């Protein structure tokens, strides 16, 4: 279901997964692995570092980048932090929990336009059609 994430969050999740599974890695190596520029990687690292407390990303001019984690924090923590930032997952959760009954209510709750709600729903529907359900215009899951 990572395909539902927007491009930025998907890239940030890829960065976190790579950092979780490696020791030190340079920005250039990381950029090559995820097919992005070093500048994009540096910007993402800054944003990611803010969202993953108590974990942290440390940088060294010589060694590169490392994810500092403690043994009590499971890998699922990074996924939960990414999902917290995802408009798509927030929208899905809101619909699944039956908190809204219209696009207008959904747009008010999420502080986005109805047009953006429609775009996100269309993008989600493209991915979930393989699971034989979809979100209708009446904000129902069928």
Please describe what each predicted stretch is.
Residues 1-142:
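Short, basic/aromatic recognition patches that contact phosphate-bearing ligands
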């Amino acid at each position: 279901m990572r395909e539902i994430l927007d491009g930025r969050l998907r890239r940030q999740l890829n960065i976190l997964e790579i950092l979780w599974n490696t020791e030190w890695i340079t920005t250039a190596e990381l950029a090559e692995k995820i097919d992005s520029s070093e500048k994009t990687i540096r910007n993402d690292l800054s944003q990611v570092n803010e969202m993953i407390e108590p974990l942290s990303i440390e940088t060294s001019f010589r060694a590169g980048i490392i994810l500092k984690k403690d043994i009590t924090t499971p890998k699922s923590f990074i996924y939960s932090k990414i999902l917290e930032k995802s408009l798509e997952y927030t929208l899905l959760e809101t619909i699944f929990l039956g908190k809204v009954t219209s696009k207008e209510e959904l747009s008010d709750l999420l502080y986005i336009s109805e047009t953006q709600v429609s775009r996100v729903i269309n993008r989600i529907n493209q991915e979930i059609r393989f699971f034989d359900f979809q979100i209708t215009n009446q904000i129902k899951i069928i």
